[in-house]
Amino acid sequence: MCRYILFTLLTIVTFSVSFSQSDHVAIKWNEQVLEAIRNDYARPTVHARNLMHSSAIMYDCWAAYDTTSSEHYFLGNTIGSFTSVFDFENFEPNIPSNSLEKMKAQEVSMSYGVYRLIKHRYMSSPQWSSTLLNINAQMASQGLDTLIVSTD
């Protein structure tokens, strides 16, 4: 009986956590990257790099708005021969103080970052039109304009 109760509790906790996490924008964009991979040629090395870059983009977009974050991957760093210039001092005053507004800003930032990555990396994919429809629909579901190309 005790095992049954323990199993039931663990199942409930597991599913409640997985359902609540599936609504996060990072999960949704990761699914878009995986779908773009399915719509492309089999190129494991390229796709591994794209997954890493999408994760780094989402992390940096989150970390830019999180004042307790001590490290960034691209922002303000040099990776190989590429330097990403980022002015933390001028950016920090623009971070919303309200936690809900900050979370929304992080989600918007992540969305534009991964949207642009997918557009750039998969435009020569054999099923590019399907991928473009998917990512445009994702942006529309968040109320974001795909025509904005600002780097601010």
Residues of each region from the PLM?
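Acidic/polar surface patches and capping/hinge elements
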Residues: 21-152
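Bacterial Sec-dependent N-terminal signal peptides
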Residues: 1-24
